[in-house]
Amino acid sequence: MASDPPPVRRRRGRPTVLDPEAVGTAALRLWAERGYGATGWDDISAATGISARTLMRHFPSKAALAWVGVPAATRRLTETFRTLPLDIPLSDALRAAVVASVSDDALVLSAGGYWMRVVAEEPELAEASARAYAPWTEALAREIARRRPGAPTAICHAVAAAYREAAQAALYDWARGGPDGSPAHAVDALLRLLDIRITTPEEAP
């Protein structure tokens, strides 16, 4: 059996400085070893060196620990779009930004393939995925609307959701494979198979 993750230490006499991604990584390792349902806040507290009360104050639910990397991924997504010209093909822009959003994801890189395996196998975590990624999906939908003026809002959101599902499917396959190679490369390879074309009402026949 794998050893327990090293504690996320805090300095005595000072307010707790909590690293959400380090706590999330520790929780995911415990879930992979012991099972999600069998791991409580006290277990996560013992693994991180942070009191259960403090953990529950910072995280709205145990499931939220699986998605602590979403804010950083959303920032990478929007920052990448700012560097991309508006006149490049939409599929190229979306692929570049989505890949950038996962390329430096500390949770994916540090937790390894068991992150996606745990999420895929635990219904509570899988059901929380779309809700947790809502800020990321909304940011992607806004960018699609900016690059395709006149496109219906529903279409922009549908395409954004499709890219979210495609990226997660690529990460699931990457995790099941070992994982070997880069998670960003796995996402890039899958998204290259997508060719999104949005027709605005003015362009419709």
Predicted regions and their residues:
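Hydrophobic alpha-helical segments that form the core
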Residues: 4, 142, 153-174, 185-197
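A secondary-structure capping/hinge motif
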Residues: 63-65
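N-terminal intrinsically disordered/low-complexity leader segments
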Residues: 1-17, 188-205
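Hydrophobic alpha-helical connector segments
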Residues: 75-115
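Amphipathic alpha-helical packing segments from all-alpha helical-bundle domains
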Residues: 123-148, 154-161
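Basic, helix-initiating cap at the start of DNA-binding domains
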Residues: 1-52, 67, 72, 76
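Residue-level detection of the helix-turn-helix DNA-binding "recognition helix"
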Residues: 46, 60-61
